[in-house]
């Protein structure tokens, strides 16, 4: 791979508390899974370098709290996102019902074009007993199809068994890069560094 500018991409991961957002991140970044549940307070993020189409990409994966009392912080954490992942638990119908609320909250806070901005919907915890499943694959796909014209992809995964986790984040990386590339490329693209410490020539006689 030839030397070239590193691309930084921000990915926001949303969903109700306890659906496994942190577990998916840790499995992808650290290849670790913990059975212990610890609620995310506010937001946290992990980074991982990946190569997409011969480009070096640093993914910033933002894990946001699912509790309602932290949703007011959304604008600060959503700003600058290149892709949004919304996670639900296939064994919890309520968490799936919340998917559209999370999507609308993100769109409201960021003013993104809902037809163009990439969303990935993830049904997590498919490793559990199938008899306990509350959200069928058919139901989830029907939801995605109902958003005509939207840039939305659905995955099912298991953070515990590392099922589809790599494929999921490879798709996230590709969609985020495509979205970033579609915007005007003016950030960090100067031929020379800006010398902010250089004094300005003051030709004004005003002392104010």
UniProtKB/Swiss-Prot annotation:
CDD domains cross-referenced by the UniProt entry: Rab7 (cd01862)
GO cellular component terms attached to this protein's record: cytosol; fungal-type vacuole membrane; late endosome; nucleus; vacuolar membrane; vacuole
GO MF annotations in UniProt: GTP binding; GTPase activity
Any single biological process term in GO: regulation of vacuole fusion, non-autophagic
Family: Belongs to the small GTPase superfamily. Rab family.
Broad class of where this protein is predominantly found: membrane
PANTHER family in the cross-refs: RAB FAMILY, YPT_RAB-TYPE GTPASE YPT71
Keyword Cell membrane assigned: no
Regulation of its function: Rab activation is generally mediated by a guanine exchange factor (GEF), while inactivation through hydrolysis of bound GTP is catalyzed by a GTPase activating protein (GAP).
Residues engaged in binding GTP: 17-23, 33-40, 66, 124-127, 158-160
PTM sites of type Cysteine methyl ester: 208
Signal peptide: none
Lipidated residues (S-geranylgeranyl cysteine): 206, 208
Protein name: Ypt/Rab-type GTPase ypt71
Keywords: GTP-binding, Lipoprotein, Membrane, Methylation, Nucleotide-binding, Prenylation, Protein transport, Transport, Vacuole
Motif Effector region, residue numbers: 37-45
Cell compartments where the protein resides: Vacuole membrane
Disruption phenotype: Contains large vacuoles.
This protein's encoding gene: ypt71
Pfam families: Ras (PF00071)
Function: Ypt/Rab-type GTPases are key regulators of membrane trafficking and intracellular vesicular transport. They act as molecular switches that convert between GTP-bound and GDP-bound states, and regulate virtually all steps of membrane traffic from the formation of the transport vesicle at the donor membrane to its fusion at the target membrane. In the GDP-bound state, Ypt proteins are predominantly cytosolic, solubilized through the interaction with a GDP dissociation inhibitor (GDI).
PROSITE patterns xrefs: RAB
Organism listed in the record: Schizosaccharomyces pombe (strain 972 / ATCC 24843) (Fission yeast)
